[in-house]
Amino acid sequence: MTDQKGMFNNIYKNLVTPILKKDIGIDAEYLTNFSLSLLTFSSKNRNWPLISRIIKSLNQEFCVVDKRLHQKICGIDFCNPVGLAAGFDKNGNAANIWKDFGFGFAEIGTVTKFAQSGNPKPRLFRLAKEQAALNRMGFNNHGAENLVKNLSLIHI
């Protein structure tokens, strides 16, 4: 395999950044769900040869191994202090892929005992000028039992 270091940075810079910086009418929640679906599929099929190569490339590009970044907090070891904030993967569908993006931890977060649909749509808004998003999701998730099932399927 050829050296692909920088490939994902180029994809992000040339494809993702223009979409995020300029509001071209793509619904923010749709874009988020689409991205999470791709990541979930990749996470669940990471042993497929093509997906395995892509994930390996992600890992090589984004993961920094440096013992100076290691953290031990409350007896828990973290390879680095950079984490994925709560709310993106509320149901733990892609929980075993976050480390391949270089995260030292991921906070699943926003999980309730029972499933709930959250606030009515629209509830996620892109603020292109501010390069930000406004989140009024309202704790939509499939519930704690579903999260436990998802995490146990991927041995987390």
Per-region residue spans from a language model:
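Conserved, mostly hydrophobic/aromatic
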Residues: 27, 84, 106, 147
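N-terminal small/glycine-rich loop or linker at the start of catalytic domains
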Residues: 63-82, 127
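Amphipathic, non-transmembrane alpha-helical secondary structure
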Residues: 92, 96, 100, 144-152
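Active-site cofactor/substrate anionic-group-binding motifs, chiefly glycine-
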Residues: 78, 94-111
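Active-site mouth loops of central-metabolism enzymes
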Residues: 80-90
